[in-house]
């Protein structure tokens, strides 16, 4: 079980990403545009660097919704492999069952 502070930190990061997503996208478009002048590009780079570090989507970590476990996360279900197996064995995941061949 992950510490509650880690879960809270990830929730805060998710909020920051959502809050600054539009601004980051606009600045990145200016930076990557070939028609932008060097001065405008440099200003956009400085503004992008001034944004909060945690507002970058790359800093988010996928975590299990039940335990907060960061490894063995299955995106399709939002659970770690351990909790997914437990839920499957209880029959709580429709269409999913233990393989047998």
Swiss-Prot record:
Q: Name one Pfam family in it.
A: Ribosomal_S14
Q: Answer whether the UniProt record assigns the keyword Membrane to this protein.
A: no
> Which gene holds the coding sequence for this protein?
rpsN
Q: Which NCBIfam families match?
A: PRK08881.1 (NF006477)
Q: Would you identify the family this protein belongs to, as annotated?
A: Belongs to the universal ribosomal protein uS14 family.
InterPro entries assigned: Ribosomal_uS14, Ribosomal_uS14_bac/plastid, Ribosomal_uS14_CS
Q: Which PANTHER family match?
A: 30S RIBOSOMAL PROTEIN S14, SMALL RIBOSOMAL SUBUNIT PROTEIN US14M
Give the HAMAP family listed for this entry: Ribosomal_uS14_1 (MF_00537)
What keywords are annotated for this sequence in UniProt?
Ribonucleoprotein, Ribosomal protein, RNA-binding, rRNA-binding
Q: Which organism is it from?
A: Shewanella pealeana (strain ATCC 700345 / ANG-SQ1)
> Protein name, please?
Small ribosomal subunit protein uS14
Q: Which GO terms describe its molecular function?
A: rRNA binding; structural constituent of ribosome
């Amino acid at each position: 079980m992950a510490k509650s502070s880690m879960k809270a930190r990830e929730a805060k990061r998710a909020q920051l990403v959502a809050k600054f997503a539009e601004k980051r996208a606009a600045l990145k478009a200016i930076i990557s545009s070939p028609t932008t002048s060097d001065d405008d590009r440099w200003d956009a780079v400085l503004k992008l660097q001034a944004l909060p570090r945690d507002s970058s989507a790359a800093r988010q970590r996928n975590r299990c919704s039940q335990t907060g476990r960061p490894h063995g996360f299955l995106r399709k279900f939002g659970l770690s492999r351990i909790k997914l197996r437990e839920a499957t064995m209880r029959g709580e995941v429709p269409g999913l069952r233990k393989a047998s061949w």
